Amino acid sequence: MTTPISNSPSSIPTVTVSTTTASSGSLGTSTVSSTTTSTSVAQTATTTSSASTSIIQSSGENIQSTTGTPSPITSSVSTSAPSPKASATANKTSSAVSGKITSQETSEESETQATTSDGEVSSNYDDVDTPTNSSDSTVDSDYQDVETQYKTISNNGENTYETIGSHGEKNTHVQESHASGTGNPINNQQEAIRQLRSSTYTTSPRNENIFSPGPEGLPNMSLPSYSPTDKSSLLAFLSNPNTKAKMLEHSGHLVFIDTTRSSFIFVPNGNWDQVCSMKVQNGKTKEDLGLKDLEDMCAKFCTGYNKFSSDWGNRVDPLVSSKAGIESGGHLPSSVIINNKFRTCVAYGPWNPKENGPNYTPSAWRRGHRVDFGKIFDGTAPFNKINWGSSPTPGDDGISFSNETIGSEPFATPPSSPSQTPVINVNVNVGGTNVNIGDTNVSKGSGTPTSSQSVDMSTDTSDLDTSDIDTNNQTNGDINTNDNSNNVDGSLSDVDSRVEDDDGVSDTESTNGNDSGKTTSTEENGDPSGPDILAAVRKHLDTVYPGENGGSTEGPLPANQNLGNVIHDVEQNGSAKETIITPGDTGPTDSSSSVDADADVEDTSDTDSGIGDDDGVSDTESTNGNNSGKTTSTEENGDPSGPDILAAVRKHLDTVYPGENGGSTEGPLPANQNLGNVIHDVEQNGAAQETIITPGDTESTDTSSSVNANADLEDVSDADSGFGDDDGISDTESTNGNDSGKNTPVGDGGTPSGPDILAAVRKHLDTVYPGENGGSTERPLPANQNLGDIIHDVEQNGSAKETVVSPYRGGGGNTSSPIGLASLLPATPSTPLMTTPRTNGKAAASSLMIKGGETQAKLVKNGGNIPGETTLAELLPRLRGHLDKVFTSDGKFTNLNGPQLGAIIDQFRKETGSGGIIAHTDSVPGENGTASPLTGSSGEKVSLYDAAKNVTQALTSVTNKVTLAMQGQKLEGIINNNNTPSSIGQNLFAAARATTQSLSSLIGTVQ
């Protein structure tokens, strides 16, 4: 039965294809018949093989190709019409394709022109020119009518080639000399496929008989040009015998390595319908690769292709489809990240039609799904050379077979954009490879780059869906698992893959799980530089999300603590306690902590999904919004594995951030609950209540829940801050850092829609993560506030105070200061407690003590002495000199235009690196570990003790007053507004002067 391809007008021919499988690895032969209403021509051609016409440099290997005895292959094209008829017949004795084919064109009118001769028909065809019209609906391929000529070249022991001559040029010479030949190239995709399928081949080691004799004279080994984005061009290129002589085989796939372009043409499983070109570049420098690296990358890709295709089609696609509530099959990942460093492969969304649309940007709350790519990192086999042969065509030219299943190979439904061929990118960065098959550009960086490669896979989807992945000899689509899918262009920037290796270690992780919370990174002097928060977060997440895929489809297990507790403990104490699974116990019920375990904080380990995206598209998605809070994933016994927190988070965010771009420039809108409440409810009850917008009502003001967003927004620290982006713009970034906390977006009425939390977060993270890669491999710098304070202030007050890097974290700023600035000085550390023999209990030890008969007051930075052990005595002369200038001998204040006391102290702090002027000593005289007062019968000891006591009291007073003065520069205002002897300013300086006198007395006594 012959079934038309589509309900096209009668002027469009009907094409039927007969395909049989030949022996010895042949991909089969095809007989094509066409019927139109215009003319009728039956032609059978006879040609012999010949060489092509120009020379190109080979890629360093001499590849020998042999062919067997050719068998006759006949192909007929018949038409019937009232016009005159003509026929031409010839015999074909080499393994080439003869005849011509007219194919169906859709969506645009197709015109066919044929020219025949009235006299004797020669062995070469007359010109037949057929305009090619693009197709965008149901036709699988863009076929073009061409004329083909063949010539003879002698076989002297090395190569026998099939040559396709130049297009549109009549050749009156049927046979010429051995070393030259002309003809018409095959531009018709179906014609090229028929020729390629008519060839059989065997493989042998690549270096076998490379020094065997070649043909006499100088054979023409030139290769034709091709377009990597046009499938028809690729097929015509591969059908050239010179090209076939240079093709290689690996793992059942056929490849042509083009060293001049740093690319390779890939024919998966020998299926010519799935041919595509892959551009390979260094991921960071965008430079082309050398031959060795190019072949290594090609071998790895060939080795893991079938494993990846099988795992995607059999496991990942059904899983993702069930979570999204859609029918499985035909869903491609937006991108695939292959990480050479951690030997993993992860595929990312979008998974549903809504997010795959052109006007929708997927949210940042999705996660990837790990896909098995096989053991491609344990070494790959070498390439094999291909020994080409030929196989006969079917004996009966009158038997024709047509495809009755519309949409399957070879007439698969083309994608929506036939004229634009998608580029599939494979990016190898930091030892990792990123395969980008969609419109998502995934960029990711790492602090320790090893090798970076990028592979660009270009296919022409005007004919077939070239993103169809299959593991067998596919007759159905291209690089896809089941059905067709939309393919779009995508380029990529430097990216780090946010994936997990076999041992569960992230690529930017500085320590393994057992060292979580420890100060692993060191400075030049070898001292630890700070707590490793990422390692602690990772260890906690590995415990509460034990799923095979990093828990992306499972809920968090109940534990003795949540992510908020872990981060808080590491920031405050330098390490976190061990996370222990406690069945039946869900841990603290305070929403402040439960929220911290929410969506995508685990992604912090690898700088989050959206880093480096050209279009700001995030990587992953667990479920759609309709399944929020439900236990969507199941284990092997069919029982639900846990609540789907990510879906609940996504649904809530879609409600309170209703903007076109995921609400990045809007809201959040006031609602009956916030993100903390949602996550808490899902963890506690398995589901969250519906989020309802309540105009006039704000979200919960409980600071615990607003700080909870730390977990989510820490993830934004790298993704939404734009680190690694090619254009420096994040997908959710609404404003620059200077506008942080402002109501930048406006609604229809022109009024601000809400505080811009993301901008404030971005500005804070840019300050505390100044590293080249967004600070992903560096600890955050100590500052006067953390991310939780930022979010809380913006939600409560509409703006956040300025983040200032400081050795100490501020003790809570007062935004109501005279100039609207919070304190830049850290809070004074609490007084240490020591056991004394006199009290035998906990008593406050003096901040200034005596060691070895010498008083030494040291400045402290983060609880330890600063390098060089700067003493307090170095500051005292500056203070005394300043006070002597501003006060007369009788104690009256003289208003000077010079620097103020606060400026002097601040300058000293900057020079020494001290966070504050804090007196401290290591030990005191007496028994070890005690603070024994210096009392005794000696009058000198008593006097010295009294002097030290006075100095301590004076230092405490002046320190408190200086700290107060520095907050908002109040000191200058007090002095300027109070000029009487009884003013507060005079009293303050009187106390400072008394302190100076006491200090001078103490220094003199000690010296």
Swiss-Prot record:
Residue ranges, compositional bias (Low complexity): 1-96, 423-442, 469-491, 619-635
Top-rank taxon: Bacteria
InterPro entries according to UniProt: Chlamydial_TARP, DUF1547
TM regions (residue ranges): none
Coiled coil: none
Bias-annotated ranges (Acidic residues): 597-618, 712-730
The keyword Signal appears for this protein: yes
Signal sequence extent: 1-51
Biased composition (Polar residues): 118-163, 177-186, 200-210, 443-453, 507-523, 732-743
Stretches the record annotates as Disordered: 1-186, 200-224, 387-533, 543-562, 578-645, 655-674, 712-757
Entry keyword set: Signal
Keyword Signal: yes
Comp. bias intervals (Basic and acidic residues): 167-176
Protein family (similarity comment): Belongs to the chlamydial CPn_0572/CT_456/TC_0741 family.
Name of the molecule in the record: Uncharacterized protein TC_0741
Organism the protein comes from: Chlamydia muridarum (strain MoPn / Nigg)
